[in-house]
A protein has these predicted regions:
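FIC/Doc superfamily catalytic core
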Residues: 1-229, 233-397
């Protein structure tokens, strides 16, 4: 194949749909093109497909924006393990993806520390436990910890027929994966222990792979193997976040990744399907279609829960250092950052949600932080809505 033809095919908008490429360029041309990609550009991974052959990826064809990197490397000023606003959306979107009914009010109720009142809230509580577990960087990625994460977030809430056997880390029978156009079986049971050990070893390897790419590869491979009877997608998304937390991306749990997936979950499932369909044509499994999807539809669209600009933080930090911020005000400020992010709130709402301060204390806090330029205020009738961020005049309403 000459260079001009190769370049034309490489830049084709249907690059990751080899069946469409065949229609446009011919079966022979696409086969030769795929072979050249594998030989000259694809990087092998220490993971295998269902035939026991290595997975590959094309690192230069899934670009991550600089802004996405900055977002995930930003340090949330909240003292909490995760953003309440962001993780409310994360849990809500996860259940949307799985077609499980939930409400944001029930999710916030559980995240605020209340006990579950029904089966729906028990599932939410499981997600909360999972998020708390991966938020602790002392909880390293091991097969034992992965099993524990699965049990507390999902496994404990499944019907008996979908539960793992005692002392089993993975399923003991066949499973079929739904979500795409046609169901397909997961990895054969006897191969799961070896494949999952390789996956965990890969997560812990210092191999120079871009960490955001690697997180998405872990996400893909986990769901591809499907090690459980149920809850695989949910655990794959938690695994993705867990890896980013372990790698020092502090904003990962202040970012509702699953919201972007839920907005177009068909594209999410199609990315999986493209990997498998392309393998039938190319003769090897290239995970780049999933990486390309994740970079464009998730990473490059990220907006971490809003925090004040640097100048506002300096105002707060200076006041804190000078003893002008009380301990209760510090706790309230951290709660506001975590619970509301960029959302508006009222003093009554903050009193109800925070649960550990009198209304007079809440009122004094919002007035003081508005005067400092840390909160904006908007009057609507008899109500005042506050939001994190500075105002033009800094005067109280």
């Amino acid at each position: 194949m000459d260079g001009a033809q190769f370049a034309k095919m490489l830049s084709d908008k249907h690059l990751f749909e080899l069946n469409r490429m065949e229609y446009k360029y011919s079966t022979v041309s696409v086969k030769e093109f795929a072979e050249l990609l594998q030989q000259n550009f694809a990087q092998p991974l220490p993971l295998t497909d269902f035939s026991g052959n290595k997975l590959f990826y094309l690192p230069n064809l899934a670009q991550i924006s600089t802004n996405a990197m900055k977002q995930l490397l930003s340090v949330p000023v909240s003292g909490r393990n995760f953003g309440l606003s962001a993780m409310t959306e994360e849990i809500y979107a996860t259940f949307q993806i799985e077609s499980i009914r939930s409400t944001r009010s029930s999710i916030r109720y559980i995240l605020d520390g209340y006990a579950p009142r029904d089966e729906q809230e028990a599932r939410i509580y499981g997600m909360k436990r999972g998020l708390e577990f991966i938020a602790n960087r002392q909880n390293r990625i091991t097969e034992e910890n992965l099993h524990y994460l699965y049990q507390i977030s999902t496994g404990d809430y499944l019907p008996d027929e979908d539960r793992l056997l005692p002392n089993h880390f993975y399923r003991h029978g066949e499973v079929f994966i739904v979500g795409g156009e046609e169901p397909r079986p997961g990895l054969p049971t006897e191969r799961l222990p070896g494949a999952m050990k390789c996956l965990v070893d890969f997560a812990n390897a210092n191999d120079g792979i871009n960490e955001l790419h690697k997180a998405a590869i872990l996400h893909f491979a986990f769901a591809y193997y499907h090690p459980y009877f149920d809850g695989n997608g949910r655990t794959a998304r938690l695994f993705h976040l867990w890896y980013l937390v372990q790698q020092g991306y502090p904003a990962a749990l202040f970012t509702p990744f699953s919201r972007y997936i839920a907005e177009n979950k068909d594209a999410y499932y199609k990315a999986y399907e493209r990997v498998e369909r392309n393998a039938l044509i190319s003769g090897y499994t290239d995970v780049t279609p999933f990486l390309f999807y994740f970079c464009n539809e998730v990473y490059n669209r990220l907006q971490v829960d809003a925090v004040p600009p640097k100048t506002d933080l300096e105002v707060y930090q200076t006041a804190l250092a000078e003893g002008k911020i009380t301990e209760k005000e510090r706790l309230l400020w951290e709660y506001v950052l975590s619970a509301y992010g960029a959302e508006e709130f009222t003093t009554k709402q903050l009193e109800k949600d925070f649960r550990n301060a009198a209304y007079a204390t809440i009122r004094t806090f919002v007035m003081k932080f508005h005067e400092m330029g840390l909160l904006t205020a908007r009057k609507a009738g008899n109500r005042v809505f506050y939001r994190v961020g500075g105002t033009s005049d800094g005067r109280p309403l």
